[in-house]
Design a protein with these regions (language model features):
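Bacterial Sec-dependent N-terminal signal peptides
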Residues: 1-33
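Inhibitory N-terminal propeptides of secreted protease zymogens
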Residues: 31-140
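Active-site-proximal beta-strand/loop segments in catalytic clefts of secreted hydrolases
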Residues: 39-41, 107-108, 128, 183-187, ...
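N-terminal domain-start motif of subtilase-like serine proteases
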Residues: 93-97, 112-113, 137-183, 206-220, ...
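Subtilisin-like serine protease catalytic core
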Residues: 168-206, 212-262, 276-279, 292, ...
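Catalytic-core environment of secreted peptidases
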Residues: 194-205, 352-401, 437
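Hydrolase catalytic cores
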Residues: 227-230, 250-254, 337, 381-443, ...
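Substrate-binding/access-modulating region of protease and related hydrolase catalytic domains
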Residues: 233-236, 249-343, 369-372, 389-403, ...
Length: 464
């Protein structure tokens, strides 16, 4: 699911400019831009691969060691020398990507932004954001009464856990303990007030959008619902897919515009997740078109590498992280195909099925432009149980909710099989699908069986 986000300036400022325009035809409406500036190298970055503790947490370093992964130049921060020279031009650096070796700069002079191409260390520039003529500021619904505690007599999540046989892992004691999960989304509305979400194992939160929100808990509710599918731990009422895991809440999606700048925000969030030692990322965000028609991409670029966000997603497994992402909800519209970064390599792209195991009409389909099977696997996304913005149990549709089911399941499986690498886990999940022998572009490898994976691995290793 793609959600839309808040942006600066708010509408009252635009209204003021519109009045001035009506008074004087000579006044030109101010407009802001963002430019992605790719750099040639990292000379003068001031860091060394021999001292990774200067730019990675100990947990991130240990994750690489455990999976026998080598550090490389993409792990190094950007050149401070280059950053200083860019800032000296009078533009504002609002985001950085060390993996892409690029920065996102903001300014109100397109000519000034374009002049950055003249710098000797700049590889290329790309205009990724043009401010719209007018926008409404996102308004979070006001609450006048306290949120309720969950109520009911049935376990609302029993079906969605059982469909992928995750309930058996939970019963065996594998509930995500010791695993760290990052949720990349557009907002986590009232996750700080809803009782069931206040009790989750949250480590922290960050906002990577420019301009940042005053409070990510007063932004869109989409991320809160996604989080609930994984993290809530209310016995016999609502059990998330990884209720004992620890969670980072990372906002990287604007809520009212769609532009390629959001790829930069996503990359910054993913790199932060890597640096703090996250094991699994859930991204229930996807892009198939942007507000500016010139920024839209054709199907032939759905190859895992043409778009920045997909390139960064394809790198995560090589950093020791499993990325689980939603396939998209375009199955019943003209696009139909998966959305980026679901086209990435070495990730688990998740489509949506009903409780009967039938694909939902909205679930996006594959293949990728280079012929790879997508989606990878399926989970419940038709009437999936979530906690809604009123703090109550509800059933909602979307691959956005199928994805966190699989992300949490991967965290639980990794807890059970700590010696596996990210790439090995991804392949094990695919192989457990009920259509692994005959994959297609609707179901991918089918509905995975996490109990089957664990049983097989224990027997293979001689531990019944």
């Amino acid at each position: 699911m793609t959600v839309k986000g808040k942006i600066w300036p708010p509408i009252r400022i635009f209204a003021f400019f519109v009045v001035l325009l009506s008074m004087s035809p000579c006044i030109i409406l101010a407009r802001n831009y963002m430019m992605r500036v790719s750099l040639l190298d990292k000379q003068g970055c001031g860091y060394s691969l021999q001292m990774p503790e200067a730019f990675l947490s100990q947990r991130a370093i240990e994750r690489r060691i455990r999976q026998h992964l080598q550090l490389d130049s993409t792990d190094l921060p950007l050149s401070k020398l280059y950053l200083d020279k860019i800032a000296a031009r009078g533009v504002r650096i609002v985001s950085q990507s060390k993996w892409n070796n690029s920065v996102l700069v903001f300014g109100d002079s397109l000519a000034l932004l374009k002049s950055l191409a003249d710098l000797s260390f700049v590889r290329n520039i790309e205009l990724v954001y043009i401010e719209p003529d007018s926008l409404k500021e996102f308004e979070c619904p006001r609450r006048t009464v306290a949120f309720p505690e969950l109520d009911g007599t049935d376990d609302a999540t029993a079906l969605q856990l059982h469909q992928i046989h995750l309930d058996q892992l939970h019963q065996a004691g594998f509930r995500g303990k010791g695993m760290m999960v990052a949720v990349l989304d557009g907002g986590f509305q009232y996750a700080d007030h809803i009782p069931a979400l206040k009790r989750i194992n949250k480590i922290g939160e960050r906002d990577f959008v420019f301009p940042p929100s005053h409070n990510i808990y007063r932004e869109h509710s989409h991320g809160m619902k996604v989080l609930s599918v994984m993290a809530v731990n209310e016995k016999n009422l609502f059990e998330g897919s990884a209720p004992e895991a620890e969670y980072w809440l990372l906002r990287c999606e604007q809520t009212q515009t769609e532009s390629r700048s959001e790829e930069d925000f996503w990359a910054a969030a993913a790199e932060f997740a890597d640096s703090v030692g996250v094991d699994v990322i859930n991204s229930s965000l996807g892009y198939s078109e942007y507000d500016d028609d010139e920024q839209k991409y054709p199907y032939r670029q759905l190859d895992g590498h043409s778009m920045m966000i997909s390139r960064m997603a394809s790198m995560l497994a090589q950093k020791g992280i499993v990325l689980v992402c939603s396939a998209g909800n375009s199955g019943d519209d003209s696009w139909k195909k998966i959305t980026i970064p679901a086209d990435a390599e070495d990730v688990l792209t998740v489509g949506a099925v009903t409780s009967d195991g039938i694909n939902t009409v909205f679930s996006s389909v594959g293949p990728t432009a280079d012929g790879r099977v997508k989606p990878d696997v399926m989970a419940l996304g038709g009437y999936c149980s979530v906690i809604n913005a009123d703090g109550e149990i509800a059933q909602q549709n979307g691959t956005s909710f199928a994805s966190p089911l699989i992300a949490g399941a991967v965290a639980c499986l990794w807890q059970a099989l700590p010696d596996k690498t990210a790439c090995e886990l991804i392949e094990l999940v695919r192989q457990s699908g009920d259509r692994y022998q005959w994959p297609d572009n609707i179901y991918g490898y089918g509905i995975p069986d996490f109990a089957k994976i664990l049983e097989k691995e224990k027997y293979v290793n001689g531990n019944k």
